Amino acid sequence: MAKEFSRTRRIAQQLQQELAQVLQRDMKDPRIGFVTVNDVDVSRDLSYAKVYVTFFEEDEKLVEQKVAALDAAAGYIRSLVAGRMKLRVMPELRFIYDSSLVEGMRMSNLVSRVISNDEAKQKQHGVETDAEQGETKDEGDK
């Protein structure tokens, strides 16, 4: 039976926390700006780590520039994190842009827009929404 948390998963979680702190506090590169570390996948032999990051930018060129800046500083970031973690081998860092947060926000906005459009159409045609029907029933019970 496998352990609930494998060693690589524990290391990935600690690496994610340390990377987030280093990127927020120690990185002074203005090209990077505010970055969020969403996830870290560490290879089984601990030689590589894929670091999934998100920026508050939607422009693809800016995102590519920020990822390139992180990749260029990967050695420096790796050395800062290595000083904080007790590992014999510090994984080589590869930064990857994670668009899931931006896509999730986009989908949420689309759903909200569709709901508000439906409610507006229902009001135009005189159809009560579920919330309005509940209010009418409550008033009739009194």
Swiss-Prot record:
GO terms for biological process: maturation of SSU-rRNA. Keywords: Cytoplasm, Ribosome biogenesis. Its main location: cytoplasm. The keyword Cytoplasm applies. Pfam families: RBFA (PF02033). Residues 119-142 are annotated as: Disordered. PROSITE patterns: RBFA (PS01319). Belongs to the RbfA family. HAMAP family: RbfA (MF_00003). This is Ribosome-binding factor A. The gene is rbfA.
